[in-house]
């Protein structure tokens, strides 16, 4: 879907698809503009941005990724269409994900929103694209299960040969007590 539909006329469907945790991948081609109306700002365009004709955007943007997180989406990512190394693992991860997956892909409109005063232009995004973390695709492996008693710990071997230590809290522990929970994990 485009950002125009997802953040404007189709925002109701977008919100309820997330709320219902529909098992799907929702790609948004986010260019901050309505191409069919020759450069009108979409609801995702940044406040400080100008259009091709030099007009200021007067409205705060709708951030589809933040909205998806707030609504409980279980897989949310944003990437730049010009960064294959980042985008491909995100797409693979979204396809493998069970539940609602949103990929907000900043994809400059080279006809109506690719100029120096646009925060969604190719050059602006290329120069300001900062990965929050390294993404990689982890293929599905055989499920690792274990069983151990309350109050004990166990070391579990992972698929890559590394180990993880797990500790099961005592059955009398109250996880609803924030103070005790924080003390326990410190």
Stretches with model-predicted labels:
Residues 9, 36-37, 111-114:
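Short helix/loop capping segments that flank catalytic or ligand/cofactor-binding pockets
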Residues 42-94:
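Conserved thiamine diphosphate
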């Amino acid at each position: 879907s485009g950002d125009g539909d997802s953040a404007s006329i189709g925002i109701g469907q977008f919100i309820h698809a997330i709320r219902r945790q529909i098992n799907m991948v929702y790609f948004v081609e986010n260019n901050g503009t309505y191409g069919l109306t020759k450069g009108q700002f979409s609801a995702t365009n940044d406040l400080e941005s100008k259009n091709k004709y030099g007009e200021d955007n007067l409205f705060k943007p709708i951030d589809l990724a933040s909205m998806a997180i707030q609504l409980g989406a279980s897989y949310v990512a944003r990437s730049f269409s010009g960064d294959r190394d980042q985008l491909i693992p995100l797409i693979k991860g979204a396809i493998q994900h069970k539940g609602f997956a949103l990929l907000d892909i900043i994809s400059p409109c080279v006809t109506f929103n690719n100029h120096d005063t646009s925060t969604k232009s190719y050059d602006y995004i290329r120069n300001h694209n900062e990965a929050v973390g390294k993404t990689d695709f982890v293929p599905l492996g055989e499920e690792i299960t274990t069983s151990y008693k309350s109050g004990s710990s166990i070391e579990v071997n992972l698929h890559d040969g590394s180990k993880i230590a797990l500790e099961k809290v005592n059955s009398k522990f109250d996880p609803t007590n924030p103070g005790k929970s924080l003390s326990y994990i410190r």
